[in-house]
């Protein structure tokens, strides 16, 4: 089949539409503080998009690259389309923010500027300024002897236009840098938040004594945050990375956000020094630095404005009184997070660190929280003399510094730390524990779609799989040998590994379904679909009558509802949990269910080390089948992709199905039913039966 550019949706525009679906949560019947969270998430996503994707397009344009995507849009065409899209959507963001804050005021929760406070609260703000703000802010003059300062990426500042009180004709420009150590808002009372910049503005003349404030404007800058590291030439990768992190702080400016109706001379002053293209200047009639809205959205005093808190549950066969190794030795176990608890994953490593029979622990780490109990357990194990091998991916974007910290701590404890494979990121999520029982070695594996991160495990949907099967032991051992040694054979037998092997396997399974024509069925859930070869194979399968359902949270470059894709349906689910699992079903393959750390994107399939895991266990397959069925039935959180690249909400039927809420209810029902059941085997069987029936 010959493809043409008009058969693909542009990657960047598809991502923007994903972020629009995040913002669209503000239009739904959600608690007010939940809506505020979605504004914070939307703005955080947009920050990263500008730091990486827009910055990259600017570099391609500067380098004279003409085409950089399957749809053959040039970098300049993409930049123009992005700017047009975001300038239009800015008005929607402003409207949602104003609507939400107005509704919050009816609930007696306020964001108030200094000038709108009563005298008592103004006095409290004044006291806070002199005790907490004044000592740490940085007043900056800009003139012939004071060059324009370095502004950190995503830094928040106040630009000022001032004049000498004795000589009003002498106008000067400067700025007040607001350090990140200060909270975004001052909580002047239990229900009133004051933006920090309005307090600073009020006291600007005390910051610049002898000068009169003529105008001020809050602004925020975004820099190119992508890093290019010459790994081939690096003798000490850790040192090279640390140098790269320092250089990243000096990346080119790619965006300026500034308050609307700012003094024209202030805007000109900033543009002159930052050299930002005028279309990359965004003027807002609302507050800036909205990722910091989490400070308000997390207010526990207003719990009625938040969704009910769900506590993940641990289900049989896991039991706090039973060794996790005994449970995994009996059967393969699959859990779906965050509906089921992440605790068994932590217990897997914690128990291994304390078990005297354990001789080896191997693990990959990609994104780890700052206070990681899992990494601490690895440190304890290494300190106790166990053989601990950890692949710490130092190139995990925006987690580099945290991963550097843990890599050093693990090395200091005696662990063997691997920093990666030259030219690739290691994105696979896998751990292996080896126990010596008598004269035999026993292997236990955990393979996952998500990170070893207890914090994200509470808000990301992911799938974890525990097994002690020999074929998985063989392949995970080979995988860790590839990571730690030299190997030209990067192929596994039961697991599939990228680069290359996962893509080959996926294409092979699509071809099998294609050969079955109208009997073929494919269901695939992932974060993003970009790879043009896989998209072409799906088009060919569709034309042969294969029924294809794709559940894709983010980017999708495939066009449904065309003659060549009339049997392909694409939906996206956006809810309070970030859909992060990758689950694939191919009706006529054996096995026919898979989980993976990899999306169907060139970067995952060709430039990363990833794993795809076949699921053989019948209970686990039944669980995945129910998971996919629920997501395909969702008519609350789901959006349908149209052939023009836009999305529409799926209309609700008489039966309302919110897949995330339904899974919370299912798991809670199982947990409640089994809580008092002391027969472990009966409890395990009942848990499987209930999950399947529901």
From Swiss-Prot:
Stated name of the protein: Polyphosphate kinase
Organism: Campylobacter jejuni (strain RM1221)
Enzyme class: transferase
UniProt GO molecular function: ATP binding; metal ion binding; polyphosphate kinase activity
Protein family according to the UniProt entry: Belongs to the polyphosphate kinase 1 (PPK1) family.
PANTHER family (alphabetical): POLYPHOSPHATE KINASE (PTHR30218:SF0)
Catalytic activity as recorded in UniProt: [phosphate](n) + ATP = [phosphate](n+1) + ADP
Described function: Catalyzes the reversible transfer of the terminal phosphate of ATP to form a long-chain polyphosphate (polyP).
Active site: 427
Entry keyword Transport: no
GO CC entries: polyphosphate kinase complex
EC number of this enzyme: 2.7.4.1
Post-translational modification: An intermediate of this reaction is the autophosphorylated ppk in which a phosphate is covalently linked to a histidine residue through a N-P bond.
Gene Ontology biological process terms, A to Z: polyphosphate biosynthetic process
Residues holding Mg(2+): 367, 397
Gene3D superfamilies in the record: Endonuclease Chain A, Polyphosphate kinase middle domain, Polyphosphate kinase N-terminal domain
CDD domains referenced in this protein's UniProt entry, alphabetically: PLDc_PaPPK1_C1_like (cd09165), PLDc_PaPPK1_C2_like (cd09168)
Residues that bind ATP: 45, 460, 553, 580
Cofactor(s) this protein requires: Mg(2+)
Gene: ppk
SUPFAM superfamilies for the chain: Phospholipase D/nuclease, PHP14-like, PPK N-terminal domain-like
Keywords from the named record: ATP-binding, Kinase, Magnesium, Metal-binding, Nucleotide-binding, Phosphoprotein, Transferase
Cross-referenced InterPro entries: PP_kinase (IPR003414), PP_kinase_C_1 (IPR041108), PP_kinase_middle (IPR024953), PP_kinase_middle_dom_sf (IPR036830), PPK_C_dom2 (IPR025200), PPK_N_dom (IPR025198), PPK_N_dom_sf (IPR036832)
């Amino acid at each position: 089949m010959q493809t043409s550019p008009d058969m693909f949706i542009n990657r960047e525009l598809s991502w923007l539409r994903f972020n629009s679906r995040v913002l669209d949560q503000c239009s739904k019947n959600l608690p007010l503080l939940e809506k505020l969270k979605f504004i914070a998430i939307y703005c955080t996503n947009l920050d990263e998009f500008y730091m990486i994707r827009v910055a990259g397009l600017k570099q391609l344009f500067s380098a004279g690259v003409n085409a950089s995507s399957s749809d053959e849009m040039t970098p300049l065409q993409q930049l123009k389309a992005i700017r047009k899209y975001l300038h239009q959507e800015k008005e929607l963001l402003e409207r949602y923010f104003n609507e939400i804050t107005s509704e919050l005021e009816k609930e007696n929760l306020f964001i108030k500027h200094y000038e709108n406070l009563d005298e008592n609260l103004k006095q409290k703000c004044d006291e806070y300024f002199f005790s907490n703000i004044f000592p740490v802010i940085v007043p900056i003059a800009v003139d012939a002897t004071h060059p324009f300062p370095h502004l950190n990426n995503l830094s928040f500042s106040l630009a000022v236009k001032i004049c000498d009180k004795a000589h009003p004709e002498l106008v000067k420009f400067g700025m007040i840098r607001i350090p990140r150590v200060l909270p975004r808002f001052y909580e002047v009372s239990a229900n009133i938040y004051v933006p920090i910049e309005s307090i600073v503005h009020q006291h600007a003349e005390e910051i610049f004594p002898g000068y009169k404030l003529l105008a001020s404007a809050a602004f925020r800058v975004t820099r190119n945050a992508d890093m290019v590291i010459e790994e081939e030439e690096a003798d000490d990768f850790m040192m090279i990375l640390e140098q790269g992190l320092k250089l990243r702080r000096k990346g080119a400016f790619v965006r300026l956000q500034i308050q609307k109706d700012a003094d024209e001379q202030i805007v000109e002053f900033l543009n002159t020094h930052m050299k930002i293209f005028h279309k990359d200047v965004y003027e807002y009639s609302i507050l800036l630095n909205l990722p910091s809205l989490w400070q308000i959205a997390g207010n526990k005093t207003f719990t009625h404005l938040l969704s009910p808190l769900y506590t993940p549950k641990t289900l049989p066969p896991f039991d706090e009184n039973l060794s996790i190794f005994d449970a995994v030795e009996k059967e393969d176990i699959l859990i779906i997070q965050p509906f089921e608890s992440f605790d068994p994953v932590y217990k897997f490593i914690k128990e291994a660190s304390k078990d005297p029979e354990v001789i080896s622990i191997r693990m990959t780490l990609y994104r780890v929280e700052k206070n990681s109990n899992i990494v601490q357990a690895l440190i304890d194990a290494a300190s106790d003399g166990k053989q601990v091998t950890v692949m710490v991916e130092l190139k995990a974007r925006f987690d580099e510094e945290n991963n550097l910290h843990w890599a050093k701590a693990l090395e200091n404890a005696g662990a063997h730390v691997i920093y990666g494979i030259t030219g690739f990121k290691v994105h696979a999520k896998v751990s292996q524990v080896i126990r010596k029982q008598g004269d035999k070695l026993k292997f236990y594996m955990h393979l996952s779609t998500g990170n070893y991160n207890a914090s994200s495990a509470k808000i990301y949907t992911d799938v974890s799989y525990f097994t002690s099967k020999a074929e998985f032991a063989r392949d995970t051992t080979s995988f860790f040998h590839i990571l730690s040694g030299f190997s030209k054979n990067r192929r596994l037998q039961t697991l599939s590994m990228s680069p290359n092997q996962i893509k080959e396997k996926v294409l092979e399974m699509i071809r099998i379904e294609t050969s079955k024509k109208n009997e073929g069925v494919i269901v695939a859930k992932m974060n993003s679909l970009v790879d043009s070869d896989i998209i072409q194979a799906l088009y060919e399968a569709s034309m042969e009558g294969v029924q294809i359902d794709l559940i894709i949270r983010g980017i999708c470059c495939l066009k449904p509802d065309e003659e060549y894709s009339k049997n392909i349906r694409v939906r996206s689910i956006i809810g309070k949990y970030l859909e992060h699992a990758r689950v694939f079903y191919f009706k006529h393959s054996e096995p026919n269910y898979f989980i993976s750390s990899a999306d169907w994107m060139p970067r995952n399939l060709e430039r990363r080390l990833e794993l795809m895991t076949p699921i053989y266990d019948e209970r686990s397959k039944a669980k995945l089948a129910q998971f996919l069925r629920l997501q395909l039935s969702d008519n609350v959180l789901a959006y349908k992709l149209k052939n023009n690249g836009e999305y529409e909400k799926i209309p609700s039927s008489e039966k309302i199905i919110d897949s995330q809420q339904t899974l919370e209810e299912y798991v809670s029902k199982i947990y409640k039913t089994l809580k008092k059941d002391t027969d472990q085997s009966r409890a395990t069987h009942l848990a499987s039966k209930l999950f399947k029936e529901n």
